[in-house]
């Protein structure tokens, strides 16, 4: 990817690993630094997409690309145009940005970011291996598309359906434990904070589920984990399981299949997954995965810099 860029594009794409730009995290339509598809010729676009494809699973890559296509839908249906922070927003599926942090090589520590409206992936690599892919955000607006030419596209369908199926399976006692509010929060609770605040692990514990519910719960959990490239997905799965699958909780708020909105989260150990669908009469989904101890490879970078300090 780097080798396809002109000197000017390199200057706008490559940053130091230590820059605060690396840990900026946003999923709304704002102006961003880095370079975007709008800056690239067809060869650079191809190389950029190849980098993204190499960093995600096929499932994660396809979701990301379909979310970009939703910008075309919004361009058709948003009349009058959305005004955000005093500026009219013109939807553009090319307005997705790339940053590289540090010097990519098989022996170095470096990172890169892909971000635009409703997509944010943050990767850190060491010794040619992805060691962090969080925070990661995927959203969909509309959650279900019902206009000509898009065949009722529903990008985050499994996230919605599996969560709804799990809630629908609860008996009265389980539901009282799992539901922490009749009203869904207006957005994901951790927002786009650099450091996701630790929130209470409310809801029903994995041990309180029956065997079929446990299977549903794990299928839902893995729907999120399997967006990542296989190696990192397995590392994250191992971390979650080794810290104790029995410590995981599922909590929800609002109502399924309702225009009032639906929210759920999976939480345990360092893992936090949030799903929220309340905006636009519950047709606008936000999802996020956070590693409370290692977003942006925070814990690994601390050890790395400690080691450098000792050497000097």
Could you tell me what each predicted segment is?
Residues 1-312:
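A cross-kingdom marker for long, charged
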